């Protein structure tokens, strides 16, 4: 299967026109496509199936739970497969069954270990102010982000432990994971190095990688 990846387009400000990649079988949108959501309509009549995992900026200025429900409704209307702690199985052109496992996988600030977590969470305060997200009337602060991140990680771990169900629609041959946040320090932008703020962009999910054919992420 040939996968086209688009992420972090920020079409709310950037002048960019997405185009289908020749020969692609599937488009993955790995988050931060448009904080206003309006540009999602560009992918409604895409020539291939479209899988979308929301980024943190899809929740800017919104209640995260209400925003997710709204995104689901909009993507359902547009024919886009939104994955947030969900899986989707499709058949590749060669007949193999591909399981896509998707979650935003918010940052848990453990990229540099638990001892460095407080520093990483302090560094995250800037990004939280930019995002302006809420949950149940409270600021979606680093503690709330970490709590949601751990829910995502637990779901991801349990999902990756599952085995294919032979002779059923739930059968698959290989697994592809899609997250918005990077799954490893190896995913970090080398320009910024190992600084506390990097833990707001990547997680230490290297232990979840065995058995995963491909891990796609944004940021």
What are these regions (language model features)?
Residues 1, 25, 48, 96-97, ...:
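Short coil/turn segments at beta-strand junctions that form active-site/ligand-binding loops
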Residues 1-52, 59-67, 135:
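N-terminal active-site segment of His-dependent metallophosphoesterases
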Residues 1-4, 88-102, 121, 125, ...:
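Beta-strand-turn-beta hairpins that frame and shape the catalytic cleft
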Residues 5-7, 27-32, 51-56, 81-86, ...:
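Active-site neighborhood of phospho(di)ester-bond hydrolases with catalytic His/Asp-centered motifs
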Residues 10-15, 34-38, 57-68, 87-92, ...:
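Active-site environment of divalent metal-dependent phosphoester hydrolases
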Residues 41-45, 49-53, 96-99, 183-219:
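Conserved beta-sheet core of the metallophosphoesterase superfamily
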Residues 44, 82, 88-97, 155-171:
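Short amphipathic alpha-helices and their capping/turn segments at secondary-structure boundaries
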Residues 101-176, 181-192:
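Active-site-proximal loop/helix segment associated with metal-binding centers of metalloenzymes
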